[in-house]
């Protein structure tokens, strides 16, 4: 019988955005900051590393970037498990564009082709496994009810994990947070400039409701997310603790909540027989490099010339 240690650790990193100098845009400081995070993680010596998406700067338009992202993750020397993010496979699906002129929201939609490219180049998802007495699962939640083949696969996965034997804890890895301001929040309007960022960052009400129902049936105790590049203190609702993760690349959305903090870093979780305890680790060094280039956000094709 395998002896389960009384205390052990895993880390959650997200939105690391490893870029390439061959691209039309590149921020070398972000890559440097990942190197800093990697050294800090090695010093902690966790048993697992969960990677919550956006491992490449532009995997959705330049999938060759995934190769380097995989190399730097392997170099940490900690077993890792990954799900995609929107910069890897595309944004949540919309049939309407916003009023923003710097992007085409419909053209940014996640597609089955991009999801399959991620599976081919990085790894399969969704997934679920037991480590010690904890079940870990990961899925790309934003495709729920999207009508894609991978969304149908997600439905099967959610039904299957709901039938598995219960575990002491069950950690679910997501990219998008399931909610922005409240678990019962209404639909945000993509065409309202005041609501656009909340629409962009969150999950719409109906898929959110179905995801939470499935998570509850599966005995999920913790949901880890990224995407917003801003952490908040863990929020527990109806037995599920929601953990909003920080980015190692760039801060954003830090002024949206009174308790929001967009300090760059990553999350460590210490597992004991009684609890999973959270600790934030800010980067010990943040790059001051100014030699990057290219536009931010989701530039239209004509803005992607190097």
Write out the residue ranges for each language-model feature.
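Short aromatic-enriched loop/helix-cap "lid" or pocket-rim segments at secondary-structure transitions
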Residues: 23-25, 92-98, 102-103, 182-187, ...
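N-terminal active-site segment of His-dependent metallophosphoesterases
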Residues: 1-66
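Feature marks short, surface-exposed loop/turn motifs that line or immediately flank catalytic pockets
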Residues: 17-20, 88-90, 178-180
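A short C-terminal boundary segment appended to hydrolase-like catalytic domains
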Residues: 1-5, 222, 267-306
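Active-site glycine-centered loops adjacent to acidic/histidine catalytic or metal-binding residues
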Residues: 15, 53-54, 85-86, 175, ...
């Amino acid at each position: 019988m395998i002896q389960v240690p009384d205390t052990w650790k895993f880390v959650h990193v997200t939105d690391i955005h490893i870029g390439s100098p061959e691209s039309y845009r590149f921020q070398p400081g972000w890559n440097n900051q990942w190197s800093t995070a990697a050294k800090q993680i090695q010093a902690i010596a966790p048993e697992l590393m969960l990677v919550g998406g956006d491992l490449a700067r532009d995997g959705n338009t330049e999938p060759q970037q995934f190769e380097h992202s995989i190399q730097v993750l392997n170099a940490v020397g900690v077993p890792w498990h990954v799900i995609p993010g929107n910069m890897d496979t595309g944004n949540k699906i919309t049939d309407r564009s916003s009023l923003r002129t710097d992007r085409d929201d419909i053209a940014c939609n996640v597609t089955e082709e991009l999801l399959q490219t991620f599976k081919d180049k990085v790894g399969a998802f969704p997934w679920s496994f037991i480590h010690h007495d904890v079940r870990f699962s990961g899925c790309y939640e934003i495709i729920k009810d999207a009508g894609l083949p991978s969304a149908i696969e997600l439905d099967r996965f959610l039904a299957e994990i709901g039938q598995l034997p219960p575990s002491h804890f069950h950690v679910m890895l997501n990219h998008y947070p399931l909610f922005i301001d409240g678990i019962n929040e209404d639909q945000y309007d993509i065409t309202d400039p005041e609501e656009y960022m909340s629409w962009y960052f969150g999950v719409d009400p109906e898929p959110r409701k179905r995801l939470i129902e499935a998570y509850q049936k599966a005995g999920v105790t913790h949901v880890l997310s990224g995407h917003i590049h801003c952490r908040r203190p863990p929020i527990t609702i109806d037995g599920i603790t929601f953990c909003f993760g920080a980015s190692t690349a760039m801060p954003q959305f830090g002024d949206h909540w009174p308790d929001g903090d967009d300090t760059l870093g990553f999350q460590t979780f210490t597992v004991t027989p009684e609890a999973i305890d959270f600790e934030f680790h800010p980067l010990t060094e943040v790059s001051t490099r100014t030699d990057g280039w290219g536009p931010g956000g989701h530039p239209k094709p004509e803005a992607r010339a190097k």
